[in-house]
């Protein structure tokens, strides 16, 4: 509600018979209350006091009314509070990674070709099956320098790690994967 419209309302009502009995000082206190200052303790005429602000930059001009009721206060945080926030963010990221279970690659069985020949209508390429043609999966197990990542980083079993290393080497020989660095499309 605008202060101007409230002041106009109080001026209109001050002409009525109800407000005629009240002293003028009481009407001044009403105006002071609408202006945002503290009302005086007695009805004697006092000058409005300015509010003191310590360390905060509050601006009550009409130009700020378009932003809404947001204030321009900045919080000063201690080092322990900053570290606590950083730790909370790290924990949230770890929880999100735990929720997103990484695809564990599957070593194809020896009778893999027979499975596809028996049921051609169910020929759906499983994204997790390790294959020299599946470059997107193999790129996960190659470091930035082009080296095959160790088991500690890939979190694969020993058998899976050997199979991944063998398929990466065969994909490199066939020209599907680079020897030195990762493909440019991986970074997009």
UniProtKB/Swiss-Prot annotation:
Could you tell me which Pfam families the record lists for this protein?
Ribosomal_S18
The UniProt regions of compositional bias labelled Polar residues, in chain numbering, are: 25-71
Q: Does the keyword Membrane apply?
A: no
Q: Which residue stretches, if any, does this entry annotate as coiled coil? A: none
Bias kind Low complexity: ranges: 1-19
Arranged from A to Z, the UniProt key words for this protein are: Chloroplast, Plastid, Ribonucleoprotein, Ribosomal protein, RNA-binding, rRNA-binding
* Compartment list: Plastid, Chloroplast
Cystine residue pairs: none
Q: Which biological process terms from the Gene Ontology are attached to this UniProt entry?
A: translation
Q: Which InterPro entries match?
A: Ribosomal_bS18 (IPR001648), Ribosomal_bS18_sf (IPR036870)
Transmembrane region(s):
none
What's the superkingdom here?
Answer: Eukaryota
A GO MF term: small ribosomal subunit rRNA binding
GO cellular component annotations of the record? chloroplast; mitochondrial small ribosomal subunit
Q: Primary place of residence?
A: plastid
Q: Which residue stretches belong to region Disordered?
A: 1-79
PANTHER family assigned to the protein according to its UniProt record, in alphabetical order: 30S RIBOSOMAL PROTEIN S18, SMALL RIBOSOMAL SUBUNIT PROTEIN BS18M
The record, for NCBIfam families, names: S18
* Subunit relationships: Part of the 30S ribosomal subunit.
Similarity comment text for this entry: Belongs to the bacterial ribosomal protein bS18 family.
The protein, known as? Small ribosomal subunit protein bS18c
Organism annotation: Tetradesmus obliquus (Green alga)
């Amino acid at each position: 509600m605008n202060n101007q419209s409230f002041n106009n309302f109080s001026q209109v009502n001050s002409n009525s018979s109800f407000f005629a009995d009240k002293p003028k000082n009481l009407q001044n206190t009403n105006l002071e209350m609408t202006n945002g200052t503290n009302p005086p303790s007695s009805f004697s005429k006092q000058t409005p006091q300015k509010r003191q602000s310590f360390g905060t930059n509050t601006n009550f001009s009409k130009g700020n009314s378009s932003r809404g009721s947001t204030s321009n206060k900045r919080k000063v945080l201690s080092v322990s509070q900053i570290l606590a926030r950083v730790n909370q963010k790290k924990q949230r990221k770890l929880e999100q990674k735990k929720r997103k279970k990484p695809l564990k690659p599957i070593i194809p069985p020896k009778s893999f070709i027979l499975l596809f020949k028996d049921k051609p209508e169910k020929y759906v390429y499983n994204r997790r099956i390790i294959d020299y043609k599946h470059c997107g999966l193999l790129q996960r197990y190659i470091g930035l320098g082009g080296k095959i990542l160790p088991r500690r980083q890939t979190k694969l079993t020993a058998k899976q790690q050997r199979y991944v290393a063998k398929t990466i080497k065969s994909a490199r020989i066939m020209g599907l994967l680079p020897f030195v660095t990762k493909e440019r499309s991986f970074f997009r």
